[in-house]
């Protein structure tokens, strides 16, 4: 017997898809399978749990049982999918199997942990489950090393500093947020972190970790070392593609899908952090919301392509928040930076003086929506 639409995953992407399907069809069979508890929480909250004094269980917004009852679902929590037989249209776990009409992969992404000696001592904060496993160590830690100065690393550095901890942030790049914007734009946040007491080790490399009687010894390049109580890897995410690969689907950085969120198999779709949409991996909330709306229509028989507008990315650093949009990482842009006491507006323009990207901060973030309208689609 078919289980109708089967979704592997229970995170933000899966839940958005369920809600959009149920707005249009209250009765089509929906089955969700995931390795976690399937309780709902807001993942961006993980960047602020330490300063807010929150435990992992405090993040739960809705239990799996409440979710199943509200949306008429068959849920299989704490269940590891081991294989997908795409030809037979069957999903398999160790003790069960599910026939599907359509299958959606919403398997997310896992935190990348640098392959250095002692890497098992590094913690990750990519899920409620991961935070639950290390919350006592993080709460008790006085000295924290954050590896990676990107979006998540910068958010965590500020949060741990606000909680009164001694924070060191290390990154290979010459500036923070290097994959998102040039140093002349990120320098305002970088300066604020330094003012708060974050010790920035830029153009630096972690070479290994070793447990000691009094903490963890981190060995760095140039014959340097520091001792800390906890080390957090914030070095990016890697789309979870193992199941898709075993099913014979086309994989690049993520699970390759077209504008209809369809994989190389006509009955299998991918959504969220695991998906690579026409060559782009977009692990942000707004593209996932828009993708879920389109995919719900397509699963119910419509033929709707995904069209993504210019979208804001929010960096949640409360002492100096930032919004950005457009091709901020383009190397050929000229940046026009206007800095005032109440904030910054940085405009990235091309050779024809066309706005291609912008970054705004603090009280000037209200200018973002006007700038967004002038970006090319």
From Swiss-Prot:
Pathway: Nitrogen metabolism; nitric oxide reduction. GO terms for molecular function: oxidoreductase activity, acting on iron-sulfur proteins as donors, NAD or NADP as acceptor. Its EC number is 1.18.1.-. It is found in: Cytoplasm. Its main location: cytoplasm. It comes from the Bacteria. Gene3D superfamilies: 3.30.390.120, FAD/NAD(P)-binding domain (3.50.50.60). One of its GO terms (cellular component) is cytoplasm. It is an enzyme of class 1 (oxidoreductase). Keywords: Cytoplasm, FAD, Flavoprotein, NAD, Oxidoreductase. It catalyses: 2 reduced [nitric oxide reductase rubredoxin domain] + NAD(+) + H(+) = 2 oxidized [nitric oxide reductase rubredoxin domain] + NADH. InterPro entries: FAD-bd_OxRdtase, FAD/NAD-bd_sf, FAD/NAD-binding_dom, NO_rdtase_NorW, Rbx-bd. The keyword NAD applies. Its cofactor is FAD. Belongs to the FAD-dependent oxidoreductase family. NCBIfam families: PRK04965.1 (NF003437). HAMAP family: NorW. One of at least two accessory proteins for anaerobic nitric oxide (NO) reductase. Reduces the rubredoxin moiety of NO reductase. This is Nitric oxide reductase FlRd-NAD(+) reductase.
């Amino acid at each position: 017997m078919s289980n109708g639409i089967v979704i592997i995953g229970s995170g933000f992407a899966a839940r958005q898809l369920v809600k959009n399907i149920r707005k249009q069809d209250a009765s089509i069979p929906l089955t969700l399978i995931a390795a976690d508890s399937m309780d709902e929480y807001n993942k961006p909250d993980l960047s602020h749990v330490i300063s807010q004094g929150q435990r992992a269980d405090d993040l739960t917004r809705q239990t799996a049982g409440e979710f199943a009852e509200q949306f008429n679902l068959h849920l299989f929590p704490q269940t590891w999918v081991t294989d997908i037989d795409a030809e037979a249209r069957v999903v398999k776990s160790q003790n069960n199997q599910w026939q599907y009409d359509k299958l959606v992969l919403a398997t997310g992404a896992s935190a990348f942990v640098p392959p250095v000696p002692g890497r098992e001592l590094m913690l990750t904060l990519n899920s409620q489950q991961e935070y639950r496993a290390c919350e006592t160590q993080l709460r008790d830690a006085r000295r924290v090393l954050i590896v990676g100065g990107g979006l998540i690393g910068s958010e965590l550095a500020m949060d741990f500093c606000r909680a009164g901890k001694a924070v060191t942030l290390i990154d290979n790049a010459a500036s923070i947020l290097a994959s998102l914007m040039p140093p002349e734009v990120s320098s305002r946040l970088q300066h604020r972190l330094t003012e708060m007491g974050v010790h920035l080790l830029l153009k630096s490399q972690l070479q290994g970790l070793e447990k000691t009687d009094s903490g963890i010894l981190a060995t760095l390049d140039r014959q340097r070392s520091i001792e800390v109580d906890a080390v957090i890897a914030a070095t990016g995410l890697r789309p979870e593609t193992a199941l898709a690969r075993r099913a014979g689907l086309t994989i690049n950085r993520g699970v390759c899908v077209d504008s209809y969120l369809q994989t190389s198999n006509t009955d299998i779709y991918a959504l969220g952090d695991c998906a690579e949409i026409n060559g782009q991996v977009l692990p942000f909330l707004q593209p996932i919301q828009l993708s879920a709306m389109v995919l719900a229509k397509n699963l119910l028989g419509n033929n709707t392509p995904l069209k993504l507008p210019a979208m804001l990315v929010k960096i949640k650093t409360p002492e100096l928040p930032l919004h950005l949009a457009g091709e901020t990482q383009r190397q050929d842009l000229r940046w026009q930076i206007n800095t005032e006491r109440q904030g910054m507006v940085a405009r990235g323009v091309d050779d024809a003086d066309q706005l291609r990207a912008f970054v705004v901060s603090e009280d000037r973030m209200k200018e973002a929506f006007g700038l967004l309208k002038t970006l090319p689609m």
